[in-house]
Structures are given as C-alpha cells and as structure tokens.
Amino acid sequence: MDKLIITGGPRLDGEIRISGAKNAALPILAATLLADGPVTVGNLPHLHDITTMIELFGRMGIEPVIDEKLAVEIDPRTIKTLVAPYELVKTMRASILVLGPMVARFGEAEVALPGGCAIGSRPVDLHIRGLEAMGAKIEVEGGYIKAKAPEGGLRGAHFFFDTVSVTGTENIMMAAALAKGRSVLQNAAREPEVVDLANFINAMGGKVQGAGTDTITIDGVERLASATYRVMPDRIETGTYLVAAAVTGGRVKVKDTDPTILEAVLEKLKEAGADITTGEDWIELDMHGKRPKAVNLRTAPYPAFPTDMQAQFISLNAIAEGTGAVIETIFENRFMHVYEMHRMGAQIQVEGNTAIVTGVKALKGAPVMATDLRASASLVLSALVAEGDTLIDRIYHIDRGYECIEEKLQMLGAKIRRVPG
C-alpha cells in the first residue's frame, strides 16, 4: 500500500491546472445510460472512482472508448446486463447513480447496496422513495436494490426530499428526464455538480429547469440523443490547493477553475488574511509570507461552506493565530483526522459536532494514517507546514479524490514523494 513522505517547510509558489470534478463526472457518466446513441464526456479526472464507473459499464456489456486525453465515448445501446455487481459497487457509493437511468431507459435495474467512504450514514431510501413515486416497483433483497418500471415506463411525479441529498436529487432527476409528464423535485440539492448534470441532460435534448435552486422541474422527453460534453472543474480540489498556499504562507495560481462556485471558501480565506484575485477561469492566492488568522465556520449545503472543505480548514486553524470553531452539520463522524493531527501536536478539542482549534506556531512531523478522502487531504496540508518528515499511510483515500496530488504539489515546490508500501 503506497505511502506519502512529506518534508515540511517550503512556501508553495507557482501555478497548477485544476482537474475535472469527480462529483460531477460520476453522475454525468451515469446519465450517459439515458442516451440512445454514443455520448462523449471530456475533462474527466484520472481517479480510481472514475475508472471503477467505466469498469462497471464494461461489466454491463458496454465498451467505453477512451482517448489519450481521458475523454470517454459510451454507447449505451450495447448494454447486455442490467446488474451493477457488489464487487464494484462496494468500493464506490456513487454506483447507486446508475439506478435511476437504468430504470428510466431500460425498464429495470439491479444495483448492489453501496460502499465507499466511511463517514456517517448515507441512506439510499430517498433514491428508492423517489423512484417509487414515479411508479417503480422496488425490492431490497440479498444486498441488492431490484427495481422495475411500470408498464409504459416511469411517470412524472412531485417529490419532496425530507433531507437535502445530492445523489438523491441527481438520481431522481435522471430518471425524470425520460419519464412521462412533468416531475417537480422540491428541497432539491443546489450544488454546482447538480447544475452540471442538468446541463448535460439538456445537452442531450432533455428539459430540466431550475437546477441550482431548491425546486427543479423536469419535463420528460421520449428520447435523449448523442452529445459531447466537458465536465466542470473540481471546486474542492481548487479549494484544497488554495488552503495549501495559505498554510505555507505562499502564493498559488490555480487555472482551469471557476471562482463563482467557491465563494464561501474564498470569503473564509480572505478572513484568514489571504490576498485573492480572480479571473474568469483562475484564482490567485497570496499570503505574502504571513501566518493565517484562525476562522470560525459552519458547514451547510451549497451555497454555504462545503463539508468537503472542513478538514482542510481545521489544518489551517491548527497553525493559525488565534482560536477557531469549526461546526460540522452535514455528516457525523467527520472529525476522524483530528486524532491523527493530535500526533503532530495540533491543539484540537472535539465537542459533539464542533471542533475548537487553537493554533500553534509549529506542528511536528509524525507517522499518520488517512481515514477518508478529505481527512487525508488535511493531513497532507498539515505535513506541508510541519517540522521534519510526515509519513502518511493508506493514501488510497487521497487517490480517490485528488489527481496526481504529489506531482501538483511538487510543481509548487513541496517536498513530497510517494513510496510503495
């Protein structure tokens, strides 16, 4: 199992390109199943979860064609089996996203109950209830969700999400794209990745309106056609590299990104003392060698502060001037990285869903273990400013969400290398 060794100290300085967003790419790949012709999706990040989704299509009899720039062409007409097997689904929760498209396009689906990150309870009941509202018959047995559309196909429905669910919104929106009549999704997720998926469905000829608000209206169409689409940039990767610059007192310009989808994070970085300038597709952060100031923050659904940036800001607060409170309202069990950071000398007290972080002047390198995707990013950030070497184990978590993290950090001047386990 690979490990990362990071020697702390250097201020980051330079420019990097941001990858496509995994959390947009996965639902968009799932939505290709809705088309009745070949679809090409570009700007895919080179990540394990993307490879798993493409492998899942291969298992279903679809043969994706991948070019050298990692754009993939998928022709769902060649599908041979409507089963998403456990051995693939268990490694990636996003596999549940094929459920809605398969039931809508092919009339049935069998999808294993998902695995993935070990944070909190992420029930799939909203996906099931949404499809049932559209007339699907669903049974959960033997660890599989077995769904069948009614005769004549899914019917449009009004559905209220009693908790905001990004993947739930995406799954039901995809199913509704081919349902008969109008569907209205209320208390829908507003994330930019949901908007990107809606734009993709519309690029194939769908009729989705209101994505980015809490009410999405979908008028079902008879067929969705071939299309070519480019996935949006990854706002969490963008934010992570900006925080990396902030903790090291450095200067970083991130390119091929979108500052408008990161406003809550940019505000907090300004509060921490960063100078930030933006263009249409770039953001530059400069700390001018200063130590950041501690910030208070509370995670909440978009457009508020994203839960996927919480761990990175705990790393920032850990070496900042002052004390900051970080309140996590989205997932339980999302402070697992705190106990690893204690090994590096961080002063963090967890009380329920709040972490009180008192900044110290210096962290100390130590052997630590990644526990989930974003927590592992926070350990990398802490290691960049720690005295001495930090060895990070279980970095397959990092590889699930960050494309070429060590190469990109090396380009900015970090002392980081990957060693085989």
Curated annotation (Swiss-Prot):
Membrane-spanning intervals of the chain: none
KW Cell wall biogenesis/degradation (keyword) present: yes
GO BP: cell division; cell wall organization; peptidoglycan biosynthetic process; regulation of cell shape; UDP-N-acetylgalactosamine biosynthetic process
Positions that bind UDP-N-acetyl-alpha-D-glucosamine: 93, 122-126, 308, 330
Catalytic center residues: 117
GO MF annotation terms: UDP-N-acetylglucosamine 1-carboxyvinyltransferase activity
Protein residues bound to phosphoenolpyruvate: 22-23
Catalysis: reaction(s): phosphoenolpyruvate + UDP-N-acetyl-alpha-D-glucosamine = UDP-N-acetyl-3-O-(1-carboxyvinyl)-alpha-D-glucosamine + phosphate
Pathway linked to the protein: Cell wall biogenesis; peptidoglycan biosynthesis
Modified residue annotations for 2-(S-cysteinyl)pyruvic acid O-phosphothioketal: 117
Recorded coiled-coil stretches: none
Top-level taxon of origin: Bacteria
Keywords of this entry: Cell cycle, Cell division, Cell shape, Cell wall biogenesis/degradation, Cytoplasm, Peptidoglycan synthesis, Pyruvate, Transferase
EC number(s) from the headed UniProt entry: 2.5.1.7
GO cellular component terms attached to this protein's record: cytoplasm
Compartments where located: Cytoplasm
Family named by the database record: Belongs to the EPSP synthase family. MurA subfamily.
Main function: Cell wall formation. Adds enolpyruvyl to UDP-N-acetylglucosamine.
Name used for this protein in its record: UDP-N-acetylglucosamine 1-carboxyvinyltransferase
Species of provenance: Pseudomonas entomophila (strain L48)
